[in-house]
A protein has these predicted regions:
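Short, well-ordered turn and helix-capping elements at secondary-structure junctions
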Residues: 7, 27-32, 46-48, 74, ...
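Short acidic/glycine-enriched loop/turn segments that link adjacent beta-strands
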Residues: 22, 36, 57, 102-103
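Conserved short histidine dyad/triad with adjacent acidic residue
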Residues: 24-27, 38-55, 90
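Ligand-binding loop in jelly-roll beta-barrel domains
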Residues: 33, 69, 76-77, 81-82, ...
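Short, solvent-exposed aromatic-acidic interface loops
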Residues: 43, 111-113, 125-128
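A short beta-strand-loop-beta hairpin characteristic of the jelly-roll/cupin
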Residues: 49, 54-82, 92
Length: 152
């Protein structure tokens, strides 16, 4: 058995070639072989979001704080809040991030296949994100606002 203390691994900033806005990644674990699972606590500041991406063996997100969005390619935008669990199947193109006025934190758990856990794709554009923030999904009480989230 191994115990990893909270904060025992350094936080890293989410790289600009994978995220838009300010994102902090706190690595939690990477299971030793033959296990393939890894996990991190990821915090998105308001308006921050991942780029579109896929996972070869899928991904599970567990929202722990704030309010945010998740969307599969061609699918509806879904609002996510603390306690929500999102299961992304293998190969599903998706993105996730914070709402315009709220940070969002989730635990991200995924498995490695052939040394890969994620394949990063194109950014979610400001126009795509603003359409989400303008309540394109029609869901009530979503924590959305007219705040502009243009990134530098």
């Amino acid at each position: 058995m191994e115990l990893r203390r909270n904060g025992s691994q350094p936080s890293v900033r989410g790289p600009a070639d994978c995220f838009t806005g300010t994102v902090r990644i706190d690595p939690l674990f990477k299971a030793p072989a033959p296990a393939r699972t890894s996990g991190a606590c990821v915090t998105f500041e308001p308006c921050a979001r991942s780029h579109w991406h896929t996972h070869p063996l899928g991904q599970t997100l567990i929202v722990t704080a704030g309010s945010g969005f998740v969307q599969s390619w061609g699918g509806p935008v879904r609002v996510i809040r603390p306690g929500d669990v999102v299961s992304c199947p293998p190969g599903e193109k998706h993105w996730h991030g914070a709402a315009p006025t709220s940070a969002m934190t989730h635990l991200a758990i995924q498995e490695e296949l052939s040394s890969r856990v994620v394949d990063w794709l194109e950014p979610v554009t400001d126009e795509q994100y603003q359409a989400v923030a303008a309540d394109e999904s029609g869901q009530p009480d979503t924590g959305r606002s007219s705040k502009t989230c243009a990134q530098p």
